[in-house]
A protein has these predicted regions:
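One-carbon transfer enzymes
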Residues: 1-179
Length: 179
C-alpha cells in the first residue's frame, strides 16, 4: 500500500514494539503517515512484520542494528523513537527531526529505569513525555505529556498501567505533531 502525500516516518525501537504496533494499526484505519522504515537494535515482533506484509506496506525493516549510523536513515520527514534505548549518532541528530517517546514526565527521570525510580521516590503520578531529541539525554523541547495516578507500589502494575496510557494516547500525540 502506497500512502501518497503522507509524511514519511522512520521508527526506532528496542523492545517488543507494542507501542509501534498500536500506532501502525491506528494509522491503517485512517492513514496519516507512511512508515518508511523500522530500525531496532533487537528483533522486531512477528506481529509487526505480519502487519507490514499483510497490508503491503513499503516499509524497510532493519533488525539487530547495534550501532545506528546515517547509512540506515533514508529519506524521511521525521524519526520517531518509541522505546529506543540506544544513543543516537550526533550526525543523525543534527540532520533529522527526531521525536522521542520517554516513559516519564520530563524533566524528571531522564534515562533508564524510570518506573523503579518513581516508586523509590514515592511519586504520586506516572506518565510519558514526547520531546524533541537533542545531543543531551532526554533534554529537548517537550511537545506533549500525559499522566496518570500511581495506585500501587508494584513495578509490574505501574509498567502495565503506563503501557495502557501510552497505547491509548501516543498515536493522537504523534498525529498532532505531524500535522
Amino acid at each position: 500500500m502506497k500512502l501518497i502525500n503522507k509524511k514519511k516516518v522512520i521508527f526506532l525501537l528496542s523492545g517488543k514494539g507494542s507501542n509501534l504496533l498500536t500506532i501502525l494499526k491506528k494509522n491503517l484505519i485512517s492513514p496519516k503517515f507512511t512508515p518508511v522504515c523500522l530500525i531496532s537494535n533487537n528483533y522486531i515482533s512477528e506481529k509487526i512484520k505480519e502487519l507490514i506484509v499483510s497490508n503491503k506496506l513499503e516499509t524497510k525493516i532493519y533488525e539487530r542494528i547495534l550501532k545506528l549510523t546515517p547509512k540506515f536513515i533514508g529519506e524521511c520527514d521525521v524519526i520517531f523513537s518509541v522505546g529506543y534505548l540506544k544513543k543516537i549518532d550526533p550526525q543523525i541528530i543534527d540532520n533529522y527531526e527526531i521525536i522521542n517517546l520517554h516513559p516519564s514526565l520530563l524533566p524528571k527521570y531522564k534515562g533508564l529505569m524510570t518506573h523503579k525510580r518513581m516508586l523509590i521516590n514515592n511519586e504520586a503520578s506516572y506518565g510519558y513525555s514526547i520531546h524533541r531529541v537533542t545531543k543531551y539525554l532526554d533534554d529537548g523541547e517537550i511537545l506533549s505529556q500525559k499522566k496518570g495516578k500511581i495506585n500501587s507500589s508494584d513495578e509490574f502494575e505501574l509498567s502495565s498501567n503506563h503501557k495502557r496510557l501510552e497505547h491509548q494516547n501516543v498515536y493522537k500525540n504523534l498525529i498532532k505533531f505531524l500535522n
